[in-house]
Amino acid sequence: MATKCTKCGPGYATPLEAMKGPREEIVYLPCIYRNTGIEAPDYLATVDVDPKSPHYSQVIHRLPMPHLKDELHHSGWNTCSSCFGDSTKSRDKLILPSIISSRIYVVDVGSEPRAPKLHKVIEPNEIHAKCNLGNLHTSHCLASGEVMISSLGDPQGNGKGGFVLLDGETFEVKGTWEKPGGEAPMGYDFWYQPRHNIMVSTEWAAPNVFKDGFNPAHVEAGLYGSHIHVWDWQRHEIIQTLQMKDGLIPLEIRFLHDPDATQGFVGCALSSNIQRFYKNEGGTWSVEKVIQVPSKKVKGWMLPEMPGLITDILLSLDDRFLYFSNWLHGDIRQYDISNPKKPRLTGQIFLGGSIVKGGSVQVLEDQELTCQPEPLVVKGKRVPGGPQMIQLSLDGKRLYVTTSLYSAWDKQFYPNLIREGSVMLQIDVDTANGGLKLNPNFLVDFGKEPLGPALAHELRYPGGDCSSDIWI
């Protein structure tokens, strides 16, 4: 059992202690209506994931936001394991930044975990006025008690990779984390490692570039990101920018969970590879490609070659396995990273995607598969789209999956997702030998929501997880 502590703060003392935490019973995830044709606000869904419950794999609560077309996306906490030593802190508020409207919602999940309620709304004009930032993405809680949220743009939608700071108690906007004028040219995700005085951040593109869909000409014009920015954690400034060789659109970035670690991984979406970043003996940082998913030559698609499009990555809490999703090819992969320089493929499962048999795309040349995968049918439902956001249980034995990336790109690449809504699936993980297997008894079909098909995105457990919590 996990260590009992009567005077500790939120989360767990170490990542390995977290692995001993209780099994997840509910999951929170934002559901989006922007670009679906349904004039309804985005909402936070609560899903029952307890196999013993009569409501297993059902949405048990919906909290609608008060505005339309926010595009909720990712979420974070008011406090987490970085404040484990502070008994005055309680993980009871979920932070929901909007990637399009730039509005921030603070949701009370502490009073009634199965029926969250809105606690506070931070309007875009306050973010714009105090920070000159917009289009907000990743939210992390800090050991200082503050909440830090990455931005992708300025108020006009130009690229600007800065960070909004909120007071973790009042949720007042305090200003920017970075020094004035010290932002990165583009933003997206970030992760910090205080023992080494380092933060790393990634790049998608300017909101004006990505917001209405993907244009390959924008890649040729250099409008999509290809860098990792290395920041001095104490001085709040960029100390190194790593240009990644063959690393287009670096999205999710993760240090190893071990707070002493000096390395981690980033998923590069368009170039469909995983790159390892690491600290050199001299104190500088470098990056190297360690996994490559080959593109497939195809017919009947927007381009002659289809990348895997790695859109989410996760590390198990014991830093043993790396997981990632290929949203276009349709598979999730599991790699043993005991040797981080040479990840070893240990599991793979196809969950839909763009190359299934009987679809509009014909694969002409494939370096990996001998035939196109079968469409995925779960509980009689043919699953539209491909695997996208992933979340691992604390013990590493269950992987939850959703299928929506971002509404405008869903509409472009998987129009049937807009018509049918996304789904939530669950994969059983073999942590002894490696391996992934679909749980045929679990399906949340967001195509059957009361107001019409919705696009469900990132997943969070009430007690924290392997992409929300950072240990210091």
From Swiss-Prot:
Alphabetical list of InterPro entries matching this protein: Se-bd, WD40/YVTN_repeat-like_dom_sf
For the modification N-acetylalanine, the affected residues are 2
On whether Acetylation is a keyword of this UniProt record, the answer is: yes
Which Enzyme Commission number(s) are listed? 1.8.3.4
Tissue expression remark: Present in liver and colon (at protein level).
Q: Which terms in the GO cellular component ontology are assigned?
A: cytosol; fibrillar center; membrane
The protein's assembly and partners: Interacts with USP33.
Q: What is this protein called?
A: Methanethiol oxidase
